[in-house]
């Protein structure tokens, strides 16, 4: 990539042995990955082993490339999106896909979003929780959300570029503490920024059970009540009104947390999440949901139907 674009910072795979690769950022090691990150055959075998019928494919967030020159980010987005779309075309009963778009330049992001929906037949896009430090409430990004709503495209928001990560490198804290906070940052930005208010038909899902947002929703509400001069400057609607207006995934790792999430967000707005194939995911997707004492109808929603509603697909789409 450095040779192609003339500067560094890109993620490359170093296939140092069969079935394994190092994700490298220039000469710096980022993480080790296995062939289930790039080989659809391996993915389908592992899905069969764990009872997963359909996966929604998306780009690894570190490859959003919002830091890059916009034209280059658009180019690499096209490469990534074409790859995902090709897998979906080859295996339409096993996969659907989300694209990635160069949000550092909204006009180019909208162009690629339109291509994802109209030409590649993807169902939406995955984006980060911020864009080079800019919150998702920023007016420059509203046109992207507006285009997604008009296109009927689903949006999945995953934490990335974690705030404060340099100050908490030890103990894996960026993943354990920073990511939940980043997700809450994204939700609050879209609530207080009026994105959901202005675009009521926008279908957005947030990763990792909405991060720290559900547990701090009361604190956020209190902030709105006591300091509207700080919280309600762009949207005067009570933040609690938006509970149940967006989706979160089910990846909370704990039965009590899942019960709370259902109570706070709603049983119709929680979709099965796996974080596959990474270590903070659920190795056997749906195992927690299946273990809970919920009615079968509710389990069906959590395991399947809610995701289809968020994606905007009919229930029999993969039949």
Give the role of each language-model region.
Residues 1-319:
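Helix-coil boundary/capping segments in enzymes
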